[in-house]
C-alpha cells in the first residue's frame, strides 16, 4: 500500500507569532476534495462564516445522514517487516515481558525492535535517524505498528517515554496519503493537549519531523491574542495542536472546522479530565466524523479515562508500559525531608549550594501557589541565585522567555507552580525540589518525572510537613516501589488513618518567604540580554543573566 507521494512544492514562510509554527504558504490542490459548502455548524461555509462577534453553538451532526456523503479515506499503512513477521509467539511474549508491556484487544500487531522494522517511508525514517536515537522506546516499539495499522488505540505510559513520536510519525504518514488541503479546509490531524506548554512542545516535534513533507502546523491555546492563530488557520494547516478551550472558541466563531479530521489524538487524557475539560473534549469530538482513527494517550488509567475511551474509541487495542500502579522512575533518587514550614528556606539554600557545584545543573523548584512561587524567586534573586519564575499569571511571552532562558542554562533555576509539571520537556534537569508538596500523589510523580528522563539519573528533594500527612502513605508506597530509602520521620505517616484518599488528599502549601525584595538581576550579557534590575523586579520576571563562566552567584 502506498504511503502517498511527496507534497507539492511550497515556499517557506516564517511564522512571526508565538507558536513556532512553520507555514509554507497556501497550495492549490490537484487532487479531489469533497464539497466544503456543508459546514456542520449550520450550513455556512468556512469562508463565509459568522462575523468575529457572532458565535454559533456547536451541534453534533447527524452522522447517519452525513457519513455516507463523505469521501472514503486511507488509514491502514502498516506493512509488517519480514524480520517482525518471523518472530515466534514466544519471542513476542518475551520481548513484551522485557519491556513491561501489557497488551489488550484482538489482532494486535507484533512489536518492532528497530527503526528499520517500523515500516516508515524513507522521508520519515531519515528524519528519525538524523536525531541520533539508538533504538525505539518501549511505547514506540508497540505503538508504531498499532497506529500505522489504522486501528483506534490506547497508549498508557509515563511522561518522558517517547509517546509524542509514537503518534506524530504515523500522523505524518497519514497526512501524506490524504488529498491536499483546499482553501477553507480544516486540519487533517488534530491533537488535543491539556496545557499550552505541552501543545508547544508537541508542535516542535511535528515541525521537526514534518519538515521534509512540507507539512504545515499551528498551535492554538489560550492566554494570547487570537489574531495570529486565526491567520495561521486561515492559511491552512495539516496539523492542529490545540487546548480544548481555545479550539472551542475558534470553532464557535467560524475560524476553522473539523470536517477534514481523520486522525485524532487525545494526549494526556487523564490530565485533561483532571483539569475539567471533559465537556469541551466531548463537544469537539462530536464534530469529527466517527470513522476517524482515534489515539488516546494517558499516564494513568482511571475510570473516567476508561469511560471516555469507551464512548469514543471503536474496538481499540491497548498497550500499557509498566505497571498499572502509579510509580516513579527508578533512575530518580528520591529524598524526603520532614520539617516545618519555617525550616524550608534554610534547607532550600543548602540543597542549591550542593546542586550548584555542577555548573551544568538545571533545577526546578515547585511551589503550591503563584504567590509563593514569586516570593521564592524574589528571595533567591536577592541572594544572588539566577532564578526565574513561571506560573499561570505570567504573560505568555514572558513564560516563553523564561523557558528559553532555562533551557539554554542562562538561568538554571526555574521556580514553578504545577503549570510546569506536565508538558514542559527540558533536557538535562538534574534536580527537582518540591518546596511545597503537591495536592495529590499523581502530581508528585509527574513533578519528579521532570528529571531522570531517557535513562539519565536525577534527584528529587521534597519538603514534607505535618500539613502533608494525608500524602504520607501514598508517598511511602511510591518510594518503596522505587527501592528508595525512607526516613524514619516519614515512616510514622505510613498509616491509612488520615481521612483523605491519597489521590485527592492535599497538604497546605508552605508560607513562603514573606515579602522579599526585588531581585537584582545578574549583570548584562554582551549579546543584548535583559540586563539591569530585571523586568518585573521582585516578581521574578525578566532579570538579566550572568555568563556561565562567571558562576551561578554574584
Swiss-Prot record:
Q: Where is this motif: Q motif?
A: 113-141
Write the Enzyme Commission number(s) for this entry: 3.6.4.13
Q: Which UniProt keywords apply?
A: ATP-binding, Cytoplasm, Helicase, Hydrolase, Nonsense-mediated mRNA decay, Nucleotide-binding, Nucleus, Ribosome biogenesis, RNA-binding, rRNA processing
Residue ranges, annotated region (RNA-binding RGG-box): 504-531
Listed GO biological process terms: nuclear-transcribed mRNA catabolic process, nonsense-mediated decay; rRNA processing
Instruction: Quote the entry's note on domains.
Output: The Q motif is unique to and characteristic of the DEAD box family of RNA helicases and controls ATP binding and hydrolysis.
What is this protein identified as? ATP-dependent RNA helicase DBP2
Organism lineage reads as: Eukaryota, Fungi, Dikarya, Ascomycota, Saccharomycotina
Record gene name: DBP2
